[in-house]
C-alpha cells in the first residue's frame, strides 16, 4: 500500500468522492509513474479544506493506492521524483485486529456495564476472543429510545431510564457522531471501519476533515446496535457469543467488594438476571461505586451554553467569496480565547447546519446538546461555548461534588425556563450588557421545546458567566460576527465531559477493586465516541490478558 498526501484540488474538480478519485488516479499515475492497469485500488483517505486564503479556498486530499504487486509498489516508491518524496510513503495496512478467540476461555462471563461506544467495543472485543460477555444497559434499544424521545418532544413526558442520554448506543446515538479525535493514542480505531463494514455509514464521511454521522444514522447501524424488534435480551453484533440486556440497571451487590469479582452480579430489569463475572468493565454509576468504596476522584470538566448563529454568516466568515459553493457545504469552526483571568472560553461539538437538542435525563433538570443531520442544511450553526470547572472551583472534596454542581445548574435552568421543559435563552447583546432578554432577534432558536427569554446568569457558576462575558468579544475578533448582538445563548450545556474519574492504573484496573475495569467517557478516560471506542477495546484487552 502506498500513501500519497498533500494533493491540492479545486472546489470544482473535487466536489464529490468520485471526482476526488479521478484526481487521485491522475496524481498516482504521474507521481508513481505507473499505468492505469497497474493500479489495483485507490481510496480517498483524507479530505480537508484549506481556507487560510479566502481567495483560494481549496481541498487537500490524501489517497491510499494499492498496485497489482508488492514488487511494483517498491519500484514505484523508489522511482518517485525528489520533489514528491515528502508526500509519498509505503505503509502497512492499518486494519485493526481483535484478539484471537481463546481456546481455554473461562466459564465465568465478563460483564460490560453500559452500552455506549466504550461498552459496545469492549463487548465486541471480548466476544471476538470467545469470552461471551454480558452487556448490560439501563436504557432501551435504539428504536424504543426513539419512541421515548418522540414522546418527550411531543408531550413533554420524560422517561428517566430511556432518553437522549441513556440507552443502547449511549448519548452519541442522538447527537453528532464525530469520527475524528484529538487523542494522542495513535492506534488505528476500528470504529469508522466497523461502521463502513456494516454498510450503513455514508462512504464519503470516513475521510472528511470533520467527519460525522448524523443522529438519524445511528439507530440504523446494524453492526453496532441491537435489533429494534427484540425484548429484554436483544440480538446484537455479538449475538453469536454474548447476551445484551437492555432496560437493565445494575443494583448493589457484593460483587464490587470482593478482591476478585466471583460473586453473583445483581441487576434490576424487566427480567432479572445474575452472573458470576470473570471481570467487570464499567462505564459510570458513580453513586453505586462510591457506596462500595471504589476509588473515585474529581476531575476538570466544562460547562456553559449552546450558541447559535446563522449558518450563512459562519460560511462567509470561514470561506469568504467561496461560501455557498456546493462542494463545501456548511462551514464548521473551532475557537478558543485565553482570558486575562487565567481561564479559557472554547467552542466544543460544533454542529454545522444543526439544531440545539433537548438532552435532559432527569425530571426537573434541563440540559442541552447539539446535533446536525447528514445534510447539514439547517438555518443555524450551533456549538457549545464552555469554560472549565476545576476541582478548586468545587465547594468540597467529595468525588461527586462536580455531579452535584451539574445537577444544581440543570435544576436552575429548568426553573428559569418556566418549569415546563422550555430552555432558558438570552441574546448575546443582552448577556454582555447584563440584562435579561425579552424577545428574539433575527436568529431564531432551534431548541425543539421552545425557549423562555431570560438572563442565564442564575443557571451557571459566576466564574463561567464572567468568563463568557470576557471571551465572547475576543472570539468575535477571531471569527467575524461571532459576538453579534442577536446570536442566541441557550442553557445549559453541562454534560460535555465527566466530572469524575474512576481511578485506574496503567493496566486499566480500578486501583481499589481488582477485577473492575473503568472505561470510556463516563469513567473519565475519553472525550468522544472515537476515543471511547478505543478505550473500550483497550480495557477489554486488559481483562483478556488477566485471565
Where are these regions (language model features)?
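Residues forming the flavin
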Residues: 1-59, 65-174, 178-547
